[in-house]
Amino acid sequence: MSEINFDAMTSREMLNYLVAKNMEDARQAKARGDLVCWASSIAPCEFCEAMGIYTVYPENHVVGIAARKGAPELLAYAEQKGYSNDICGYARANLAYMDVQKCVSEEMPLPDVVLLCNNICDTLYKWYENIAYTLHIPCMVVDVPFNHDSVVTEENVNYVAEQFKEIIRQLETLTGKKFDYDKFEEVMKVAAQNAADWYEATSLCSAVPSPLSGFDMFNYMALIVCMRGKPECGQTFRKLNAELKQMIAEGRCGMKGVEEKHRIMWDGIACWPYLSHTYKVLKNYGINMVGSTYPSAWALRYTPGDLKSLARAYTSMGNNLGMQGQYDLRKNIIQDTKCDGVIMHMNRSCKMCDFMQYEIGQKLQEELHVPITTFDGDQADPRNYSPAQYETCLLYTSPSPRD
C-alpha cells in the first residue's frame, strides 16, 4: 500500500480504497496458497494478524451485498437448502455465498480456517460449524460467558484467557510455525490505538451540530471491523478526526444542506438494504443520528501484551451484558451525544439485540424522558422492512418535515 499517497486523499477516499484493497489482498493470498480465515466481526483478530493469516469477515461481506440489493437471491438459495428464514440474514446469505461464490459485491475467498467468538450472539456457533463441516476446515472457538450481572468476573476473564492459549496452540499446528509473541504485542499496540482513534471519531459526534451523520459512521465502521490490526486503519481515522474537528470549528453539520434540528440515538444494527431510505427520511425532518449502540462496540480497550486484559476487553461487549449493563450503555450514549430521542430497529435477524429493547425502551422513557419509536426491519433481508411503516413511526414522533 506504500505506493498510495494517503496525505493527498480524504478519509472517505482512504476508506473506499482500503476496504477494496483489503479484500483484494485476501484474494491474492488465497491464490498464492496462503491461509485465509473467516472470522466473526468481534473475534480477536490479533492472533491471526500476528501469524500472517489473512482475515476477512462474512458479516461485513454480507453488509456490502445487502446494501447493493443483492441479498434476496442468496437468501432464497439458503432457504431452498433448508435454512429457515428465522435464522440471521447474515448467516443465510453467507452460507449461500459459500456454495455459489458469486455476489453483487466484492468476491470473498473461501477460508482455510474459521474463528468465532460468541461475545455478540450464539447463532455464530452453528453458522461457523456448518462452514467448517462443509469445507472440511478447522473451527477455532472462543466461548465467552454471558455477564448476567453486567460485571465481568475474574473467573470469566481467566476462562477466556486460557482459551486464547488454545487458539495460539491451534494456530501453531495450522501454520507449522511458532507463535510470534513480539509480533503479537506489536499488533495489539496497533489495534488498541486504532480502537482509540475510532472511539474519538464516534465521540466527536457529541458536538452541536454533529460533524458526522451516524450513517456515515456506519460506512467508516467497515475499517474497524476488517482492518483493526493494520496501521492504515488508524491513518484513516486520524485523517477523519482532523476533518471532523475542522468542521466543528466551522460549525458545519454532517448532513449537507440541512439544519440539524433534532438529534437521535439509533439502537441496533443498520437496516442495510434500506440504508439510503432510513437516512433520507430522517434528513427530511432535520434529524441527525449522532449516537448508536452499534459502531462503538469496536472501541476495544486493553493493555498490549497482556492476555488477561485482552480477554476482559472481548468479554465486555455490550451484547454480552445483562439488562442493567445494556441500559447503562444506552443511557450514556444518549446523554453524551445530547440526543432528543431514540429509534429502535426491531431487527428480525438479531434476536440478541431485539429481546431486550422493549424493556430498555420503557426504562429510558421513564428515567430520561426521551421519546422512543420502533420500526420493524432486518440487517440483510429486505422482506422484513416496510418503508411506509418507518415513515409513519417518524411522522408521529417528529415535527413537520422541511418544505
Regions found by a protein language model. Give the residues of each.
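Internal, well-ordered alpha/beta segment that forms a basic, Gly-enriched binding/recognition surface
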Residues: M108-T173, F179-Y181, E186, Q193, ...
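Redox- and metal-dependent alpha/beta enzyme cores, enriched for Fe-S-associated oxidoreductases
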Residues: M51-A76, I269-L329
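An N-terminal, globular interaction/scaffold subdomain
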Residues: I42-I87, R92-L95, D99-C103, W127-Y128
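Conserved small/polar residues in nucleotide/adenosyl-binding loops
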Residues: Y396-D403
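Acidic/glycine-enriched edge-of-secondary-structure segments
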Residues: S2-D7, E73-A96, C226-G234, W298-G325
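Short, flexible loop segments at boundaries between secondary-structure elements
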Residues: H369-Y385
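A charged, amphipathic alpha-helical module
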Residues: S2-L35, A161, K165-Y294, L300, ...
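A short, acidic, amphipathic alpha-helical segment used as a generic capping/interface helix at domain edges
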Residues: Q101-C103, L321-K338, F355-E359
